[in-house]
A protein has these predicted regions:
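N-terminal membrane topogenic signal
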Residues: 13-31
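Aromatic-anchored segments of alpha-helical transmembrane domains
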Residues: 33-41, 103-105, 195-201, 301-310
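Juxtamembrane "helix-exit" motif on the non-cytosolic side of transmembrane helices
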Residues: 38-49, 75-79
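Loop-to-helix transition at the N-terminal end of transmembrane alpha-helices
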Residues: 48-66
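Intramembrane catalytic core of multi-pass membrane enzymes that act on lipidic substrates
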Residues: 90-161
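Interfacial segments of alpha-helical transmembrane regions
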Residues: 92-97, 172-207, 212-226
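Membrane-interfacial catalytic/cofactor-binding modules of polytopic membrane enzymes
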Residues: 205-288
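Membrane-embedded catalytic cores of phosphoryl/pyrophosphoryl-handling enzymes
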Residues: 250-352, 356
């Protein structure tokens, strides 16, 4: 009888403990959804129709990314290579999906509708400094001397394009692959904050267009004319095999949409490089899961940096600064996470302490 009473008491305590968790999870999700509508209130010129469609598009992609990750996890469970997600991971996954959609839609609003008002005041300075530091060469000339043939260029171009789906999958993949809630929270939190501090505020403070847009948006630059011509020649060679240099077509698409209405993906910004910054976070996250996978992603991160220069998207310093900023955010996330968890733990202990 004593045991049954004790078991019943534990069941009641577990149920009561689960309720606050469910309430907190629902509150976080509700706040994320409300944050998704915030631009409509602070930007009167923002049309609600295109903005809501943008949010729905990103939400759909985020849900698809979550489904892919769950499918991969399910396959790993069937083959005995991994365990299924626990209840905590399922809750985190819902939050990660909504955070992905809200963060990226907000970033697109900023990049397309706010950032163009800043202009591109730093390109000439960055280009001149790099030219001097590289003893009279532009960074793209160095990469083309080393990897200027068609095959290396296509490999770099493909690696750069693959970054987009990896970026989308990252928050959901982290939630499922990382069991440690502290590390999981740091990775997802750093992913979200990086779009604000690096991709938005950093891009505003260091506003630049990049080498591929220099002659169109900044002024004449003979070196970047040669770069574009070299890439065009490679694109023509690739066409013989039914291929192309994808970067050239994406660059033209972004140029045509610059200053236009809100669309799914647009906006021009070079420094700091979010491609390299995010690839750095991929490396950090991969090392948290496996040293072997971490080194694979380190190699991929190096490819992204080289490709960003080789294809004309970025100056060399864009990627170096982006990587440094991401490493800084990750370092800061450690004490921040400990502070948050210690506060939550203290609050939980206070609630469970018996009253006198």
């Amino acid at each position: 009888l004593g045991k049954s009473r004790r078991d019943a008491a534990l069941d009641i305590a577990g149920t009561e403990g689960a309720r606050p968790v469910a309430v907190r999870s629902a509150a976080v999700i509700a706040m994320l959804l409300l944050a998704g509508c915030a631009p409509l209130f602070v930007m009167p010129s923002l049309q609600s129709g295109p903005f809501l469609l943008l949010n729905l598009a990103y939400l759909g992609l985020a849900i698809f990314a979550g489904a892919l990750v769950l499918g991969a996890q399910r396959l790993a469970c069937i083959t005995g290579r991994a365990d299924g997600p626990d209840e905590s991971q399922r809750r985190w996954l819902i939050g990660a999906i909504i955070a992905t959609a809200v963060t990226l839609s907000h970033f697109q609003v900023f990049k397309q509708l706010v950032l163009p008002g800043r202009g591109f005041p730093l390109d000439a300075l960055i280009a001149d400094l790099e030219h001097r530091l590289l003893f009279g060469y532009d960074a793209w000339e160095v990469t083309h001397m080393l990897f200027g043939a068609l095959l290396p260029t296509l490999i770099l171009d493909t690696a750069y394009a693959v970054w987009l789906p990896i970026m989308f999958l990252f928050p959901a993949a982290v939630v499922i692959a990382i069991r440690d809630q502290n590390v999981r929270g740091r990775l997802v939190g750093t992913w979200v904050v990086s779009w604000i501090l690096i991709g938005s505020l950093g891009a505003w403070g260091l506003a630049s267009a990049g080498p591929c847009y220099f002659n169109e948006l900044i002024g004449p630059h003979a070196g970047y004319v040669r770069m574009h011509e070299a890439l065009m020649v490679l694109d023509q060679h690739a066409a013989i095999y039914g291929l192309n240099v994808q970067a050239l077509h994406f660059q033209e698409m972004l140029r045509q949409s610059q200053g236009g209405p809100l669309v799914f993906a647009s906006g021009i910004s070079a420094m700091p490089s979010m491609h390299v910054a995010m690839a750095t976070l991929f490396v950090i996250g991969a090392f948290q899961h496996s040293r072997k996978i971490g080194w694979y992603f380190f190699g991929y991160g190096m490819l992204i940096w080289i490709a960003s220069i080789h294809l004309g998207w970025h100056y060399a310093s864009d990627g170096l600064l982006g990587a440094a900023m991401m490493i800084g955010l990750w370092a800061i996330s450690g004490p921040t996470s400990r502070l948050i968890y210690s506060g939550l733990r203290a609050k939980g202990l206070a609630k469970t302490r018996p009253s006198v």
